[in-house]
Amino acid sequence: MKELLNRLISHETISTDEAKQVIFNISEGKYNDTQIAAFLTVYMMRSITIEELEGFRDALLELCIKVDLSAYNAVDLCGTGGDGKDTFNVSTTSSFVTAGAGVKVAKHGNYGVSSVSGSSNVMEYLGIKFSSDAGFLEKCIDQANICILHAPLFHPAMKNVGPVRKSLAVKTFFNMLGPMVNPAFPKNQLVGVFSLELARMYAYLYQNTDKNYTILHSLDGYDEISLTGETKSISNNSERILKASDFGVSELKQTEIAGGGSVESSAEILTNILKGKGSQAQNNVVCANAGMAIATSRNMSPHEGFAEAKESLESGKAFDSFKKLQKLSQN
């Protein structure tokens, strides 16, 4: 590790194979917490290369506990987090709206590191069971159209990193990796990233896979469609700038999509929206993101996807998916 750190501090880069080996070494407990923290810190101070990101991704996918949900042709809605915006849990809320529209969802998530409340914090608070049992996950996706894949259960090799990330409490390259390492290997993916540079890296790596994908970055910094400004969208066949008008709605103010200051208030926002008690701004931003997931899965326009998402939310189907998942979690 000493030699590696010296190279990285001297602005050298490492190869894909070397990046893979670092993750393998971390998983085998070869580095102490201080060394891991130093390694993560280097990548907060310099850009990651595509080769390095690819190596880290490949190692995590090789080491993860895999679950085969390929029969469901599911989509994952997952953001990198780390955008510093402290919105409510847009991707998680949008996942239930997507499920309510009849699109199967394999939602990858984790506890918050740089935010008050990550996807898993809210799901856990609301009584959603975390399991790596394939039978349980299939039952969830069959009956509720959605299953929750809590990252630590599927990436045990990374147990040594969790406490370090928590104590650092800022985004690290593991934020960049989260959406790439879903253990169900979903064929459809809506991924939000915290920078334009990372959006381009994702596009480069995804174009060499069989994924059907849409990568999003709001130009004012959000790792999702915020409707507070324009959003860069990169998919298999196109690059475009999305505006609020593409979904038939008006632009929002940033304060209108602010998150709760605690897990409890974040959970309340999510359930209120699904119950039909959300503000128009909250409903629109959720339907825009769910709409893009639906559009990605069903090969339709953002406007058409938005209409399906809105119907899912307003008809109560989104809340039904949530209630079914809650009920399955109690058995």
From Swiss-Prot:
Domain of life: Bacteria
Pathway connected to this protein: Amino-acid biosynthesis; L-tryptophan biosynthesis; L-tryptophan from chorismate: step 2/5
UniProt: Mg(2+) 2 binding residues: D223, E224
Chain's role: Catalyzes the transfer of the phosphoribosyl group of 5-phosphorylribose-1-pyrophosphate (PRPP) to anthranilate to yield N-(5'-phosphoribosyl)-anthranilate (PRA).
Molecular function as annotated in GO: anthranilate phosphoribosyltransferase activity; magnesium ion binding
Residues noted as binding Mg(2+) 1 in the record, renumbered to the chain: S91, E224
Gene transcribed to yield this protein: trpD
Top-tier EC class: transferase
Binding site for 5-phospho-alpha-D-ribose 1-diphosphate: 79, 82-83, 87, 89-92, 107-115, 119
Cofactors named for this entry: Mg(2+)
Native species: Christiangramia forsetii (strain DSM 17595 / CGMCC 1.15422 / KT0803) (Gramella forsetii)
Binding positions for anthranilate 2 per the UniProt entry: R165
Listed Pfam families: Glycos_trans_3N, Glycos_transf_3
Catalytic activity from the UniProt record: N-(5-phospho-beta-D-ribosyl)anthranilate + diphosphate = 5-phospho-alpha-D-ribose 1-diphosphate + anthranilate
Positions contributing to anthranilate 1 binding: G79, N110
BP terms from Gene Ontology: L-tryptophan biosynthetic process
A single Gene Ontology CC term: cytosol
The protein, known as: Anthranilate phosphoribosyltransferase
